Each structure stands twice: as structure tokens, then as C-alpha cells.
């Protein structure tokens, strides 16, 4: 009997004896989207992963995997495959069957046993075993871990990793833990995950009042109008010092609770007012021992506190893990790319001569503003923070424009700069390189920084996939985190990564990792002018690029595509530690020189792919 008949005639009846076909049994269950593979201009997807049977105790609470084989196979022939799926899906029981019996692997005990076809466990039996092993038998715990998910006909359903994050969070709370850390890569739906956690907890007697903390208005507004929209009737945004107790879900900027001069406004509210606090992008300071935001969390210490971030910060001064504890779940950038939920990327590295050899100034000369120049060689990390070389940022703008002309001039592009002045210089240089479009469409290129009201007013248009303009934006820090631009196809790195380089690097890479197939966005390209891609070799980084390309002067800047015979592996370069970065926008901290007349050009080209063993394989050299 073949596998289809075995399932239909033998395995299905055995399972359906005690499991509901419509709500608990899911056959041919696909749980990944298939990794996106990019080779030159060719884009394909690998096969999706699927389980023969996924069994759920309740919607969103998977409990068992069953892999089926035909009657010619042994009863345990599918067990290891099922175990692999169960581990990935965080499921406690895996089964294999050939229609003549079942073999069970219990991840809770590590033991295996064989079962007759009429001995397949019922949902209540598996749930009881699971609850006992996890210490969730108490009625209080059961109320929390079985609270229903929000389900809307035609709406979003949690992906497998979101279910894991949600279920592990509720289980931790059910066991009495009140500080919880979730680490999920940018673009994997942290706010949707947070919404489901809030919704489920609000179905219990444990949680009524919820505070959602963020550090930017755009993040708050996106969340209220997006994933949290089903709760809008009971939701309010904190304005000033007012906290209307008639609402149940409160969104607030950190700044609304802590004044500019350190006033502890939050103390006007009862310390037990909130039952649950969600800390969005918690790496951005809430865990610092001397942070004002830490004071907010410690004041409301009776509340359950959940920190969410793509990049937990661990330094001598700041530790998310010390405050929240080890993450209850981590879903990495690498895993998101492998599952096909995040976009892979190419890297193009134009090497500028001044970046390689430095820029020498002589004592006794002055810059464009009359400042006396020192005798020294300025290096790459000094450009645009210590010294501004007009020809350098103009060459960068020229290469960005060249790439867009060779690919698509209307690809949404973010250019990350050293500081606000650099962002303005880059905007002007890009305008001059693209005057043919800017003449008719002045918002084709915009600077969006914290000090620019006009630029920030265009942020919603940049994010909107149906709005063509702005197409290119220059920024320093404002767009580093949280801003959801699904159609961003180009990320330009002309900034610096200092003390917390890896955290910021991951956040910036995350600006492009969202997939938007309706707008032909399956991968994105990084133009790296600062050697930031050295961080790919850092052990902390977990999502390698699919290609690295270094163009020669005069050559097309777009990736030429596959070629050659594969070449040989080249070990990745060692990480380079930047010197401390001075605050770029504080004019009193240092003198910034401005010069022009330099000869700036691109000097090299290399195309490299990352192999499956993590080495760089050289495809071509020029």
C-alpha cells in the first residue's frame, strides 16, 4: 500500500478517533516559505518544509508531529524526520507510522515506545503529560497557557516561530516569571507577537491594564494603527501627563513618563496601575543601570515586563539579559532567511582611494572655513566626523546613482550617514546627480533626520509602497530602528559603527530584510562604502550575505551575476575595532574641518559568494 493510501485508510482513522479533524489535525502542514536564493539577477525559492500531520491541542498550541510512511517501510522509518520538525517547531511529541503501528519519541523524558494503531494518545493525555513535565498543572497556570489566540477570518495567523515566542512567554508567566526577554530579528513580526501576547493575557484574570513603551512617535503610531488595531476601542496614546483610567491599553513614549530634566512624571501614577508592560526595542537604553527608562520599569515593578528586541545589548554598562533574564526564545536573522521569511541580500563594496590610503593635511594650511589644519593623515573613520571632503561624498553620491541607473532608479533607498550635516551634504550631492528627475519631482530625494520637520513629514510616504516619492532618503540615526519600509531595496552604508557597532549594524541591515512579493521585493542590496561588512565575519553576526562585490573604476556597479567556475575559498577578514566615536552633532566637542579639491575615485572589484561552510568563495577578480 502506497503512502497516500496508508494515510487515508490506516493512519487517518487512528488519529481521528480522538482528535478533531477540523480544529486539531492539520495535514500537509507547511511551516516555512522556502529560502530565497539569489544568483545574479535570478531569484528562486527552495522547497517549503512541511509535516505530514501537525496536531494541536488548541489553536496555536501544537503538541505533536506525525510522519507517515507506506506499509513497506518499518514503523520508525519517519521518526528522525519527525523529530527534526518537532525540534524546530518546539513540539514535545514526535510520531512515525507505517499504518501498522506508531513509534513515539517523548522530548520531555527522552524516551521512546511503540504503540498499536488503536493506542494513539488522545489530546487530553498529551496535554496532561506536557503540563506535568513543565510545571503547569495548577488551574492558575492552565488559565494562562490555554488562553485563546486572537483569530480573525481572513486575518494574519501566527507563523510557527511567533507561536513559539507567544507560548513560551505565557508559560514563563504561568510559572511566576515577571521579567521576560524575546529576541526576534527585524521583520519577523515582533509587534504582532506582542499583540497576541497582550490579547491572550487579557483573556485571563492576570492582566487588565497594559503599557506599551517605545521611543519614537512613528513606532507608536504604526503599532496602534497596525497590529494592535483590534484593541483600538480600549487603547489610548499617553499625551503629556494625562493617564485616563477609562482605557486599558496605553501607548507611551519614554519621554512622556520622564521629563527632559529628569522629572519622574511616572510617579504621579500608582505603582500598581499596570499589570503588563511591553518594552519595544528594549536595547535602546531601558536596561542601562543609570537609565531614566530603567527607573520607570523599577517603579512599576509589580507588572509583568516583557522586553522585545532584534539586538539585545550586552556591554559593561548595559545588559538586557541582566535585567530581563536570558531570552525565552530567539529567532535569528539567519533562521529567518533560511525559512524564507526574510529577504537575503547582496553586498557591493566600492573601495575609494582616500578610504584606503587616507587624506593628508599639512600644518600651516587652512580649510574652506579658515580653520587651521593640523599635520596628520585622516583615515576612513575620520571622514565626515573629523573632516569633510567634498569630493568624497560627491563620489559616493555618483556611485549610488550609477547603481540605481543600472538597476531601477525608483528602488526605495536609504542612505545612512555619519551625522545630520553629512546627511544634508549627501542629499545635495544626490540631487545634483539626479537633477533630471528632481526637476519634475522635488521630493524624489529627501533628508529625513530628527531636526527636519519637512523631511519627517515625508516619512509616511517613503514607507507607503504605493507612494513613489520620496524614493531616496538620507538619514543619520532616525531610520535605524523600527521604521517598516517593506519595499526598501537598497541600503547604503556611509556611516560609522563605533562602540555598539554590531547592535546598530543588525538594526540597519533589518531595514531591508522584509519581503514584499507584490512589489517584486525578494532581496535587497547593500552598498557599503565604510567596510561595515567586515562585521559579517564577527561571531555575533548571524545572517551572511549571498554575494559580496567590489567594483573597479569604470565598471558597472551593479552585481554582474554568476560567472567563472566557482573559484576557491577565501577566509573572511578579521573584525576591525573602530576607535570611539565622538558625538557628531555637538559642535563644542571637536572641530570639524571642511576641504575640497581632493582626487577621489574607486580602485577595486571582487565578487564573492558565501558558501554553506561559511567561507567566502571568490567568483571573479578584476
Short names for language-model regions:
Residues 72, 256, 446-550, 554:
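Conserved RecA-like P-loop NTPase helicase motor core
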Residues 1-209, 214, 218-233, 245-249, ...:
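ATP-dependent helicase/translocase motor core
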Residues 318-411:
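Interdomain helical connector at the RecA1-RecA2 junction of SF1/SF2 helicase-like NTPases
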Residues 96, 250-253, 304-309, 473-474:
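Structural recognition of the conserved hydrophobic beta-strand(s) that form the central parallel beta-sheet
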Residues 248, 376-473:
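Conserved C-terminal RecA-like helicase domain
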Residues 72-74, 220, 257, 284-286, ...:
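Catalytic P-loop NTPase motifs of RecA-like helicase/translocase cores
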Residues 267-307:
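SF2 helicase catalytic motif II
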Residues 152-155, 168, 381-391, 395-399, ...:
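Long, largely alpha-helical accessory region at the distal end of helicase-like NTP-driven motors
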Amino acid at each position: 500500500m502506497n503512502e497516500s493510501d496508508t494515510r487515508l485508510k490506516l493512519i487517518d482513522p487512528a488519529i481521528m478517533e480522538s482528535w478533531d479533524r477540523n480544529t486539531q489535525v492539520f495535514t500537509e502542514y507547511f511551516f516555512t516559505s522556502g529560502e530565497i536564493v539569489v544568483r545574479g539577477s535570478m531569484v528562486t525559492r527552495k522547497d517549503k518544509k512541511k509535516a505530514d500531520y501537525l496536531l494541536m491541542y488548541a489553536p496555536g498550541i501544537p503538541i505533536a508531529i506525525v510522519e507517515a510512511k507506506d506499509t513497506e517501510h518499518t514503523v520508525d522509518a519517519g521518526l528522525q524526520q519527525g523529530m527534526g520538525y518537532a525540534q524546530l517547531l518546539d513540539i514535545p511529541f514526535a510520531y512515525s507510522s507505517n499504518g501498522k503501528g506508531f513509534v513515539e519519541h517523548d522530548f520531555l523524558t527522552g524516551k521512546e515506545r511503540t504503540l498499536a494503531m488503536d493506542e494513539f494518545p488522545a489530546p487530553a493525555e498529551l496535554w496532561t503529560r506536557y503540563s506535568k513535565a513543565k510545571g503547569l498543572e495548577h488551574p492558575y497556570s492552565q488559565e494562562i497557557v490555554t488562553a485563546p489566540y486572537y483569530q480573525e477570518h481572513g486575518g494574519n495567523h501566527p507563523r510557527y516561530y511567533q507561536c513559539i515566542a507567544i507560548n513560551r512567554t505565557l508559560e514563563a508567566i504561568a510559572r511566576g516569571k515577571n521579567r521576560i526577554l524575546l529576541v526576534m530579528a527585524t521583520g519577523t513580526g515582533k509587534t504582532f507577537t506582542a499583540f497576541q501576547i497582550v490579547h491572550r493575557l487579557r483573556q485571563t484574570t492576570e492582566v487588565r491594564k497594559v503599557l506599551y513603551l517605545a521611543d519614537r512617535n512613528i513606532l507608536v503610531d504604526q503599532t496602534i494603527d497596525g497590529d494592535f488595531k483590534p484593541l483600538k476601542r480600549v487603547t489610548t496614546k499617553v499625551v503629556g501627563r494625562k493617564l485616563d483610567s477609562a482605557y486599558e491599553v496605553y501607548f507611551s513614549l519614554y519621554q512622556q513618563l520622564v521629563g527632559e530634566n529628569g522629572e519622574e512624571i511616572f510617579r504621579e501614577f500608582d505603582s500598581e496601575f499596570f499589570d503588563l508592560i511591553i518594552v519595544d526595542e528594549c536595547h535602546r537604553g531601558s536596561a542601562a543601570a543609570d537609565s531614566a527608562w530603567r527607573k520607570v520599569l523599577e517603579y512599576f515593578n509589580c507588572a509583568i515586563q516583557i522586553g522585545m528586541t532584534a539586538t539585545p545589548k550586552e556591554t559593561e554598562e548595559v545588559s538586557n539579559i541582566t535585567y530581563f533574564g536570558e531570552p525565552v526564545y530567539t529567532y535569528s536573522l539567519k533562521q529567518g532567511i533560511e525559512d524564507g521569511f526574510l529577504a537575503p541580500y547582496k553586498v557591493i563594496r566600492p573601495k575609494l582611494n582616500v578610504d584606503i590610503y587616507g587624506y593628508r593635511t599639512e600644518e600651516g594650511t587652512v580649510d574652506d572655513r579658515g580653520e587651521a589644519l593640523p599635520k596628520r593623515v585622516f583615515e576612513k573613520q575620520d571622514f565626515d566626523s573629523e573632516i569633510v571632503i567634498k569630493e568624497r561624498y560627491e563620489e559616493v553620491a555618483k556611485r549610488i546613482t550609477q547603481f540605481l541607473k543600472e538597476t531601477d532608479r525608483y528602488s526605495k533607498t536609504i542612505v545612512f550617514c555619519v551625522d545630520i550635516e553629512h546627511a544634508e551634504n549627501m542629499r545635495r550631492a544626490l540631487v545634483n546627480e539626479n537633477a533630471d528627475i528632481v526637476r519634475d519631482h522635488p521630493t524624489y530625494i529627501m533628508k529625513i533626520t530628527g531636526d527636519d520637520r519637512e523631511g519627517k513629514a515625508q516619512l509616511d510616504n517613503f514607507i507607503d509602497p504605493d507612494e513613489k516619492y520620496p524614493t531616496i532618503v538620507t538619514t543619520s540615526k532616525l531610520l535605524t530602528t523600527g521604521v517598516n519600509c517593506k519595499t526598501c531595496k537598497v541600503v547604503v552604508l556611509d556611516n560609522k559603527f563605533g562602540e555598539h557597532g554590531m547592535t546598530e549594524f543588525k538594526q540597519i541591515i533589518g531595514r531591508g530584510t522584509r519581503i514584499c512579493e507584490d512589489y517584486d521585493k525578494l532581496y535587497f542590496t547593500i552598498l557599503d562604502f565604510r567596510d561595515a561588512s567586515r562585521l559579517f565575519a564577527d561571531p555575533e553576526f548571524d545572517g551572511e550575505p549571498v554575494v559580496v562585490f567590489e567594483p573597479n573604476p569604470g565598471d558597472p556597479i551593479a552585481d554582474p551575476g554568476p560567472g567563472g567556475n566557482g573559484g576557491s575559498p577565501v577566509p573572511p577578514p578579521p573584525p576591525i575595532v573602530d576607535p570611539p566615536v565622538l558625538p557628531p552633532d555637538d559642535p563644542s566637542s571637536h572641530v570639524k574641518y571642511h576641504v575640497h579639491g581632493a582626487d577621489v575615485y574607486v580602485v577595486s572589484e571582487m565578487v564573492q559568494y558565501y558558501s554553506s561552510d561559511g567561507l567566502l568563495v571568490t567568483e571573479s577578480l578584476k
